[in-house]
């Protein structure tokens, strides 16, 4: 999602199916060489007709699930949102997606999420409202549902480390229920991905000990948030989020440029300087050497 763009769906570009097919082919090659079988997740957008068509296409191309954006249904009430979600889930298992309003999402209440997790073919939720209250709404809804087969994924790029380390506990029916966010579907992890894998493993290891969070992890959490602010262009309401990701990949030689399908989307003034700053300040967050070793 973060290294393509929502605009691939527009008829004038016609890139949605080619992109899904290309990724599927790359995953096929990976599976042929490795014992690891990745979960294949396609982004699903639009009103019900478009979303079910995209889900059908993804299923035909071998995808296991769809990450369901509700951004297009910005005026719909909970009943309509749930009917839409059920329709897509009939085609393909779904991951819920709480997208922050600053980039086209909408506020989704605890009551919505409590009903959403009653859909049988919901297998996970990406939590990305960039809001602590709204994050808790989702985790509590899952905890109170009694379902332990729904995975929670971090999407709050401003709080990656603490989301992965926190044990969320709620009283449910007189007993204590604990849920954890088990992984991330993060734009920040579209870059410096080798380090992201190491970070996730480190967070899992710490969480499994049950010990207090070390001070160096709290410091690392702040450093990653600072780096993300530059890459995502937080100072300008995330206007340069996609080209910011592209710029990091360009510097590593993985992309030829930062162009976007929407020609108006480009790096914000001063954003490249901010990326320079965080790269100098936090070289341990980058994976330039790893990328260079594979070229």
Regions found by a protein language model. Name each.
Residues 87-90, 95, 100-241:
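Catalytic alpha/beta core domains of metabolic enzymes, predominantly
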Residues 19, 116, 275-276:
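A structural signal for short hydrophobic/aromatic patches embedded in well-ordered alpha helices
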Residues 26, 202, 251:
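Active-site catalytic microenvironments for nucleophilic, acid-base chemistry
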Residues 28, 32-34, 144-150, 207, ...:
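Structural alpha-beta junctions
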Residues 226-295:
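C-terminal extensions of enzymes
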Residues 23, 27, 31, 142-143, ...:
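Hydrophobic, Leu/Ile/Phe/Ala-enriched alpha-helical segments that form helix-helix packing faces
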Residues 1-113, 264, 289-292:
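Active-site beta->alpha loop and helix N-cap motifs at the rims of alpha/beta catalytic domains
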């Amino acid at each position: 999602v973060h290294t393509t763009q929502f605009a691939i769906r527009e008829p004038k570009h016609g890139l949605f199916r080619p992109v899904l097919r290309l990724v599927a082919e790359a995953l096929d090659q990976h599976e042929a060489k490795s014992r690891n079988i990745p979960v294949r997740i396609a982004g699903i957008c639009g009103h019900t007709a478009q979303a079910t068509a995209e889900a059908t296409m993804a299923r035909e191309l071998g995808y296991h699930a769809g990450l369901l954006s509700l951004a297009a249904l910005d005026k719909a009430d909970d009943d309509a949102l749930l009917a839409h979600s059920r329709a897509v889930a009939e085609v393909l298992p779904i991951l819920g997606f709480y997208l922050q309003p600053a980039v086209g999402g909408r506020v989704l209440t605890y009551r919505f999420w409590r009903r959403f997790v009653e859909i049988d073919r919901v297998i996970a939720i990406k939590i990305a409202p960039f809001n602590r209250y709204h994050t808790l709404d989702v985790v509590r809804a899952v905890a109170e549902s009694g379902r332990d087969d729904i995975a929670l994924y971090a999407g709050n790029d401003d709080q990656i480390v603490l989301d992965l380390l926190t044990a969320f506990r709620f009283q449910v029916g007189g007993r204590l229920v604990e849920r954890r966010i088990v992984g991330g579907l993060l734009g920040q992890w579209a870059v410096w991905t080798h380090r992201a894998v190491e970070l996730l493993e480190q967070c899992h290891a710490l969480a499994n000990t049950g010990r207090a969070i070390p001070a160096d992890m709290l410091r690392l959490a702040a450093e990653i948030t600072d780096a993300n602010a530059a890459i995502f262009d937080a100072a300008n309401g995330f206007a340069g989020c996609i080209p910011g990701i592209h710029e990091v990949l360009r510097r590593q030689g993985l992309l030829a440029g930062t162009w976007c399908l929407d020609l108006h989307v480009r790096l914000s003034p001063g954003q490249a300087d901010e990326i320079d700053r965080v790269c100098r300040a936090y070289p341990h967050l980058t994976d330039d050497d790893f990328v260079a070793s594979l070229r």
